[in-house]
Amino acid sequence: MEPILFSSNSHSDDRGTVFFTNELNLKNVVRTYKVQNKLIKTVRAWHGHKIEEKWISVEEGEFLVCAVHIEDFDNPSNDIKIHKFTLTPTDGILYVPNNYANGAMNLTENNSIRYFSSLPFDESVKDDYRFDSKFWDPWSELNPNFYE
């Protein structure tokens, strides 16, 4: 399975606007966390899981969010397809399946991105695989200011 972007829609009337993502099912979500970067173009990558699934929603600003499918977490190939998504708050929610690593870079100064996870924190840390932020590099073409 590949990452899926569940598109959001909206309806406006004289009261305001409602944004919705009706095709999305979050029944497997057990926790959430939000990230805000101090510097524009901060790269936070790569964070992978064999078991855990992620759903990603931009709450403020614009982000480049990327995901790579990993066959071998102990010896990953750096010559694999990078799934790239440029997301804003109105674009929808990105689903990242298990056996993927993901990363994000904020493209705006004011920014906020929310992650939804399918595992409790104590189980997630046992399924946590970190890779150097430049191991797969979709970021450099956008001149990042900081890699984490």
Question: Where do the language-model regions lie?
Answer:
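Short beta-strand His + acidic residue motifs that chelate non-heme Fe in jelly-roll/DSBH
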Residues: 94, 102-107
